[in-house]
Amino acid sequence: MRVGITKSRTCEWFNKTKRTGADFFVEDIKIRNFIEKTFPRSGISKVVVRKTAKEGEIIIFTSKIGVLMWKNWAKLKEFEDDLKKKFGKDFQVLVKEVRVPELSAKVMAEFIAQQLEARMPFRKVAKNTLQKIIEKGALGAKIQVAWRLGWTDIARVEKFIEGRVSLQTFRSDIDYFCLQAMTKYGVLGVKVWIEKWAATTKAPVTLQKKPTL
């Protein structure tokens, strides 16, 4: 919803064939799902896909660049070959580091899910995560955890807010992500909102009337 206002596009297509935009859109979703399946919980913050008719470029932004670049270097090269076999075109995969992972809603949501799956108290996890986000310069953050919290029989929703999260305007740079935490006692839903900077307000312009003679 905020693409073109505070968010840049994460997919670019250059098409000179008879393929429609829907075909490229479906292929883009398959590429992203394939990346998440190949590198699960690898601190991937964002994936940018640029495609032409014969080749493409994939830029992976991650907070754990050592996991992808060194530990999984052979797997990364194998991943490029798998992309060519699966989608029929050559892809160049680039990996870039996220300098401040605490300002990425996806990275923080994965961190919360890992803590919940390790049976850490959800209140402690949420409050510690909010503190990390605010310390890195965010204006505000909101965390929502839902379902059988604390391993109780009754499902409920708990919300934790620190600072300001203005969802009423598109001009605020708000990062959002949601996922599921697979715990021993069931599936928990995790949602994270992070406001990086506020909307800019401009003073109203007043027109001066010409004096009458």
Name these PLM-found stretches:
Residues 1-2, 7-11, 95-213:
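Positively charged, low-complexity, intrinsically disordered RNA-binding extensions
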Residues 18-29, 59-78, 102-107, 115-124, ...:
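Ordered, soluble secondary-structure elements with a strong preference for glycine-centered loop motifs
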Residues 32, 36, 77-84, 113, ...:
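Generic solvent-exposed, charged/amphipathic alpha-helical segments
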Residues 45-48, 80-82, 179-180:
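Short beta-strand/turn micro-motifs at beta-sheet edges
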Residues 49-64, 90-110:
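Short, charge-patterned binding micro-sites
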Residues 68-94:
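Acidic, low-complexity central loop/insert segments
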